[in-house]
Amino acid sequence: MGQNDLVKTLRMNYLFDFYQSLLTNKQRNYLELFYLEDYSLSEIADTFNVSRQAVYDNIRRTGDLVEDYEKKLELYQKFEQRREIYDEMKQHLSNPEQIQRYIQQLEDLE
């Protein structure tokens, strides 16, 4: 698995965490098996007694769907921004003025 594949898988895992409640059971099952459980398309197809192509199409469409949710709702983006701010805050605990600026940045995200 290449670096880009790992980055995509990690992103999809986060998007799945944020948006899984908006998906159908079938969409949830396919994404969970493919990205979280690392099943192959063939294994998923065998599990659900469908074609490999049907699984691929469903995973691709569902991936596009959660990306669209992210584009509109930005839950993952805001999560990443908050995490960066928290990391920076930890580096500046002895500087109250800087901590106050970080708190303001966090409030602005909400």
Curated annotation (Swiss-Prot):
Signal peptide: none annotated. Transmembrane segments: none annotated. Pfam families: UPF0122 (PF04297). NCBIfam families: PRK00118.1-2 (NF001067), PRK00118.1-6 (NF001070), YlxM (NF045758). Belongs to the UPF0122 family. Might take part in the signal recognition particle (SRP) pathway. This is inferred from the conservation of its genetic proximity to ftsY/ffh. May be a regulatory protein. This is UPF0122 protein SAV1236. It comes from Staphylococcus aureus (strain Mu50 / ATCC 700699). The lineage of its organism: Bacteria, Bacillati, Bacillota, Bacilli, Bacillales.
